[in-house]
Amino acid sequence: QWGNHDILWMGAAAGCRACVATAIRIALRYSNIDAIEDGYGISLLPLVSFAQHVYKDDPCTRFMPKVNDKKPFDVDAELLAKMHKAISIIQFKVEENIIEQNPAYNMEHRRLLRTLNPAAGTVEIEGKTYPLNDTSFPTIDPAHQTALTDEEQHLIDTLTNTFATSEKLKQHVRFLYAKGSMYRRYNDNLLFHACLLLNEDGGFKQKEIDGAVYYGRSLMDKYDQMAREAYFSGQNADFLWFLWCNQDSTLFGKTKMTTFERYFIDDKETHKEPSSPYYKLMEQDDGTLAARILKEFGLSGNAHI
């Protein structure tokens, strides 16, 4: 069964710019760019050039990579920090554009750049204003916060093309599609990553997609179908980003992903990512909910989740 990090790379290979930016950002955060450059033959030199030029006067101290004692930096840490910040800002911009283009994702509350005020050093989140710990945003136009600069657009287009055309990545992702799925029934076990969508009362949460209503197993089957179409049809690759971080993704299992907050806001209350109802309900379950879930997937008796 796929996990959300599988889906992230599947989305990057499918040409989703937000997935590409996120995959690079995570690699830079943990100083693990070898997996991208050596593993998949994807050059990050365009990002190096961009970051050195655009962020030359910004120390990007908040974006210094995590120290890996087992693997010392083979690239200057300050350069990695500049690359890290550069791709993070691009990620936030392209994500907000996806949200704007897909109102059905119900993620308007995650369009944080719209309320960004570098001059005042603040950002508004869910009706509350917070101070920023970093106000250097050389590529953000106060009148059009989510607009990519021409250089950013060229950079993310170049990087996305190299991800989509990497033969090694294509080989790995096609293996994931061939052998993986949203869930699997195996030897009286129901296997899935993260959760099922449930309401607070334990009922299956219904999700409307293209005029039809899905829940439980039918929703997992629909997500599986859409994930395959996103890659093999070359259309709607952004759905794979939905599966990476949306509150209605069974692969994510949280109400929001607070990446922006963790970088730019010191108040740790904003860093919290509340879990979906599934987890609390399963902790309190006397076996009734588990039995109902197993029945939904055609399993019973001594079957396990």
Q: In which residue ranges do the predicted regions lie?
A:
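Feature recognizes metal-dependent phosphohydrolase scaffolds
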Residues: 1-305
